[in-house]
């Protein structure tokens, strides 16, 4: 479960051009729940998503993933949380054109498996299932270009 309680984020804090991007944001996202963040340009959507993805910090409030309070843990533990619990697709993403669809999907799986005993065969099966979920199984072995 993901919980935000009264999150505040200010850019250029303490300066004359300070801007409060988020003020008092609270939300709960249950395991398995899908949520869409919508709003006008400049509404704070990207700021909120960067905080949720543990890419950026916040000024006050509390952010919890399961039982862990984010912001009160080490950078090493934060990296582990990003690796195990958080996924984010950027608005402007790029595929490696010379790679197949399967190879592109394998990149984050291979990265996450570094230092762990996860077999490549198992990761490939996960990647294949992911491609099936989005009805791209026919493109598994084709370059994405």
Where are these regions (language model features)?
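The feature captures the beta-strand-to-loop junction immediately N-terminal to the Walker
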Residues: 38-40
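Helix-to-loop junction immediately C-terminal to a conserved catalytic motif
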Residues: 53
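A short, flexible loop at the N-terminus of ABC-type nucleotide-binding domains that lies
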Residues: 1-4, 10-24
């Amino acid at each position: 479960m993901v919980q935000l309680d009264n999150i505040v984020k200010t850019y250029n804090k303490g300066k004359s051009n300070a801007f409060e991007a988020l003020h008092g944001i609270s939300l709960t996202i249950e395991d398995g729940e899908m949520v869409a963040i919508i709003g006008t340009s400049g509404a704070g959507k990207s700021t909120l998503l960067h905080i949720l993805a543990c890419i950026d910090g916040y000024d006050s409030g509390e952010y919890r993933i399961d039982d862990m309070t984010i912001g009160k843990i080490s950078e090493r533990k934060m990296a582990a949380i990003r690796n195990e619990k958080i996924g984010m697709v950027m608005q402007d993403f790029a595929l490696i054109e010379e790679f197949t669809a399967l190879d592109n999907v394998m990149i984050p799986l291979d990265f996450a498996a570094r230092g762990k005993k996860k077999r490549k065969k198992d990761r490939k099966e996960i990647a294949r299932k992911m491609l099936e979920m989005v009805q791209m199984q026919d493109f598994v072995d084709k370059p994405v270009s």
